[in-house]
């Protein structure tokens, strides 16, 4: 509540910042403009503080889950815990002709393939440390969009294997963090990191502008 109130108070001071804030999207042929609130939340750094509770909640959950796997047995030391998880997800209960509800045949075959080829020996490390990195990234605000994307990817994979738990909730919250990647980490490392790294499409646009400038002959020639 305190963070939300602070965010709205900061937003009320926008005219005092003397910083031009453009909340209207450029509308061209076929372009549909976004609602003002949506543009402010996803693209205005003055509202970045409102993303903190969501980042901390999801990040803490991922870090806790990853730390448990790294410190525990069967994940980074051979992957036997993951092998057991895959086995349970692909085992057809006695007296039934199909896998448990919530699993998909094609994904079940994929899990069996990984199980038979002993991918769990390295996949366990990937999942355990991946969860830790996702949690740290969200908590410190470093590459929030990428961290949230890989978090939702793991949630989606766990869900396909028939594991509900908190996966649907974290998946939904992670999607919002992916959408707000430009400002969700502004109150964190992304404030420095994103301007430094830039974006692929930004580099393409800059190249096209430079190339167009050099290729256009001066007026009057």
Language model features by range: what are they?
Residues 1-133, 140-221:
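Extended, low-polarity transmembrane helix blocks
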